[in-house]
A protein has these predicted regions:
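N-terminal, Lys/Arg-enriched amphipathic/low-complexity engagement segments
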Residues: 17-66, 233-236
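Short, solvent-exposed loop/turn positions at domain surfaces
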Residues: 61, 67, 84-87, 296
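Short, well-structured beta-strand-loop connectors
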Residues: 67-81, 99-100
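Short coil-to-beta-strand transition motifs
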Residues: 87-95
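Buried, small/hydrophobic-residue-enriched core segments of structured protein domains
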Residues: 88, 102-310
C-alpha cells in the first residue's frame, strides 16, 4: 500500500507556464515497487451476472431508497436519491432484478446488488447534435447529468463528496493521468475514445466560465476541443502522488473552507460525451488487473459496477 494518499502535500521543484498550459515538476514522492504490472493492452473481460452500487463510493451518503429487493429495474433507472442533495440520484448500472440491499451498522447502506437480465432494458436521456454541444445551457447540462446519474462523477473538494448541483466551483479538474502503482495508462484509452472525450469536455465547459483543468503526464498528447478559452492543460511530472487529483488541486487551485473545486476521472468524461450525443448511459469501463499473484496482469474492458469475483 502506498504511504501517500490523495491529500498528500508534495514539494514543488519547478513550474513552467505556456499560455493555457502548465508544467509542474514534483521531486518528493514514491513510486511503489510492486511486481505484476499490467500489460497495457485491453482484453475483453468475460460477462458478469451481477453488478452493484457501493455505498462506500459516496462520501456522507444519506440514501432515500426508490427500489426494494425483488424489483425489476432498467439501466439508468434511479435506485435511490441523496437526502442531502435533492435531485441527485444514483442510477442502476445494469438492467435486471434487485437481488439484495445490504445495510450495516445504523442502517448504513453498503451495497445494492442487481442480477442482470439477458436483455437489457434501458432508460434514455436527452441527446444533442455535436454542433450544439458548445451552446448548451447550464440547465440542460445539469438536468441531463442528474437524470442519468452521471452527476455523481463530479466530486467536490475538500472532502470528496458528491458535488452540489445548486452551486458552482472555483474550477473543475479532469484527471487524465494516474500515478498509482499498477494503474492503466490513460493516454491510449483516451485516444481510443478521442471524440467522446472531446464532447465530454465541451459539455463540462458549459457549467460556467471557471477554469476547466485537464491534468496529464508531460508526454501525453490529448485530443482537446478547440475554441474553449477556459479549458487549460497542466502537466505533472515526478513520482506518485503526481497523478492524483489532490496533488493537482493543491498546486493549481488550493481549496479552503470557502473555496470548493470539483474533479472527475477521464473515463467519466468519456461517458458524459457519449451520453449527450447518444442519449444512452455508457457502462463500459477499463480496469487494471495486476499484482504479484496475478498470472496474466492486463487491462480488462468490463462494465460499471461489475462483480469482481465473477470478473476474474
Amino acid at each position: 500500500t502506498s504511504p501517500f494518499n490523495d491529500r498528500s502535500l508534495t514539494q514543488l521543484d519547478s513550474v513552467t507556464v505556456f499560455a493555457t498550459a502548465m508544467m509542474i515538476r514534483i521531486k518528493k514522492g514514491l513510486d511503489v515497487p510492486i511486481s505484476g504490472k499490467p500489460e497495457q493492452l485491453v482484453h475483453v473481460a468475460k460477462p458478469v451476472r451481477h453488478v452493484g452500487v457501493l455505498g462506500v463510493d459516496h462520501v456522507d451518503l444519506k440514501p432515500a431508497m426508490l427500489v426494494a429487493e425483488g424489483d425489476k429495474v432498467k439501466l439508468g433507472q434511479a435506485l435511490f436519491e441523496h437526502k442531502k442533495l435533492p435531485g441527485v440520484c444514483i442510477t442502476a448500472p445494469g438492467a435486471g432484478t434487485v437481488r439484495a440491499i445490504h445495510r450495516g451498522a445504523q442502517r448504513l447502506l453498503q451495497s445494492v446488488v442487481i442480477r442482470l437480465d439477458d436483455t437489457e432494458d434501458e432508460e434514455t436521456f436527452a441527446s444533442y447534435p455535436v454542433d450544439q454541444l458548445a451552446s448548451l445551457t447550464d440547465t440542460q447540462v445539469v438536468d441531463n447529468l442528474l437524470a442519468s446519474g452521471l452527476w455523481v462523477a463530479l466530486r467536490a473538494r475538500p472532502y470528496s463528496k458528491i458535488a452540489d448541483p445548486t452551486t458552482r466551483p472555483a474550477a473543475i479538474f479532469v484527471t487524465a493521468m494516474d500515478s498509482n502503482p499498477l494503474a492503466a495508462d490513460p493516454v491510449p484509452l483516451i485516444t481510443a475514445e478521442a471524440e467522446s472525450f472531446g464532447h465530454g469536455l465541451t459539455v463540462l465547459s458549459r457549467l460556467g466560465t471557471m477554469p476547466l483543468w485537464v491534468c496529464k503526464s508531460p508526454t501525453a498528447e490529448l485530443p482537446l476541443p478547440q475554441g474553449l478559452s477556459h479549458v487549460r492543460q497542466a502537466s505533472f511530472e515526478g513520482p506518485h502522488p503526481a497523478g492524483l487529483p489532490g496533488t493537482h488541486i493543491h498546486f493549481l487551485e488550493p481549496v479552503d473552507v470557502n473555496k470548493v473545486v470539483w474533479h472527475l476521472n477521464y473515463q467519466e468524461v468519456i461517458a458524459i460525451g457519449k451520453l449527450f450525443t447518444s442519449g444512452r448511459l455508457s457502462t463500459t469501463r477499463i480496469v487494471a488487473l495486476g499484482g504479484p499473484h496475478v498470472k496474466q496482469p492486463r487491462l480488462l474492458q468490463t462494465r460499471l459496477g461489475a462483480c469482481i469475483e465473477e470478473l476474474i
